């Protein structure tokens, strides 16, 4: 083997498998049982607001999903708010319905541990609305997931937002702001777009996804300063110092949500290591998301 050869990049799936195996070697304790979504007095569950289940067209999806749960166990994550995306986008109505059906099955398999986002493509307006209502009302999904099929300020998105408002569930919206176009994502929304959408629908519960996902996190945080209806998902693989503290200073702790987007150790370490007091960390790690989820009557 040539020692100068560049190693193959490690995929997130390989990392999750390795992390789960390493954690198992280091601790013989069994996975912790799931706690009720209503916390015991003085306790707040740790809720990952941004996670993904694996599409069933992938070999080994069962092992990948199990690895996600096992890593969450080892890192002290009590709840995973999960969506599943179609392998090809824009998603067809049949495609997103299939994904949501599999998410519902995972919710049943991991009773109370996996919370579902209903993924839809607003480009199929009636099918999207019907699917959101079916998922939330019949299967207990906790929110809506929108990806990059349409910029969030496109009028085709508005009926989806109105449905989420009516059902009193949040929308986790894929977002990013770079200083060059995102390849393959011409319709990606950014923090400014979500702020504009929030001005149109101030009652909407919007979540700007993965501020640490590789774009300009400082720009995104500043863009959301005057959009109190938008929460910030702190997930992503970028581990720059000071992101959490900067967001807490400009937006306030109550608007920040813990998330991993599959970068599990980075997501947990970012909050655990932040220069904030324990009360602020508890809000970010679960209290703020718990408050959002509590807005829909049970």
Regions found by a protein language model. Name each.
Residues 52-54, 85-87, 119-123, 147-149, ...:
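Active-site beta-loop-alpha junctions enriched in small/polar residues
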Residues 46-56, 172-176, 208:
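Histidine-centered catalytic micro-motifs
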Residues 50, 72, 103, 116, ...:
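Divalent metal-coordination and catalytic microenvironments
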Residues 78-82, 86, 94-179:
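Active-site gating/metal-coordination segments in enzymes
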Residues 2-49, 62, 66-79, 133, ...:
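Mid-to-C-terminal alpha-helical segments outside catalytic/metal-binding sites
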Residues 139-143, 150, 154-257:
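Catalytic pocket-lining loop regions of alpha/beta-barrel enzymes
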Residues 52-63, 89-90, 181:
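Acidic/histidine-rich helix-loop elements
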Residues 63-68, 98-102, 130, 190-194, ...:
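Alpha-helical scaffolding within the catalytic cores
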């Amino acid at each position: 083997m040539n020692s100068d050869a560049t190693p193959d990049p490690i995929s997130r799936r390989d990392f999750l498998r390795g992390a789960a195996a390493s954690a198992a070697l280091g601790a013989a304790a069994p996975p912790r049982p799931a706690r009720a979504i209503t916390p015991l007095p003085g306790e707040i569950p740790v809720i990952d607001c941004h996670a993904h289940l694996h599409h069933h067209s992938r070999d080994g999806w069962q092992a990948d999903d199990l690895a996600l749960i096992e890593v969450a166990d080892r890192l002290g994550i009590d709840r995973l708010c999960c969506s599943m995306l179609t392998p090809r986008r824009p998603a067809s109505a049949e495609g997103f319905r299939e994904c949501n059906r599999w998410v519902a099955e995972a919710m049943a398999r991991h009773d109370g541990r996996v919370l579902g986002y209903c993924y839809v493509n607003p480009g199929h307006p009636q099918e999207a609305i019907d699917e959101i209502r079916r998922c939330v009302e019949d299967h207990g999904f906790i929110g809506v997931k929108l990806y990059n099929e349409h910029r969030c300020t496109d009028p085709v998105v508005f009926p989806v937002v109105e449905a989420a408002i009516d059902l009193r569930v949040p929308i986790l919206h894929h977002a990013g702001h770079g200083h060059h176009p995102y390849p393959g994502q011409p319709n990606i929304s950014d923090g400014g777009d979500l702020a504009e959408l929030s001005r149109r629908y101030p009652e909407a519960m919007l979540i700007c996804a993965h501020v640490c996902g590789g774009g300009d996190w400082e720009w995104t945080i500043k863009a959301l300063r005057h959009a109190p209806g938008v929460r910030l998902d702190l997930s992503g693989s970028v581990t720059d110092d000071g992101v959490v503290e900067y967001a807490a200073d400009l937006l306030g702790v109550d608007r920040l949500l813990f998330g991993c987007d599959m970068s599990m150790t980075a997501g947990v370490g970012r909050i655990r290591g932040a220069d904030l007091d324990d009360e602020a960390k508890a809000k970010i790690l679960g209290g703020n998301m718990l408050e959002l989820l509590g807005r829909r009557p049970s």
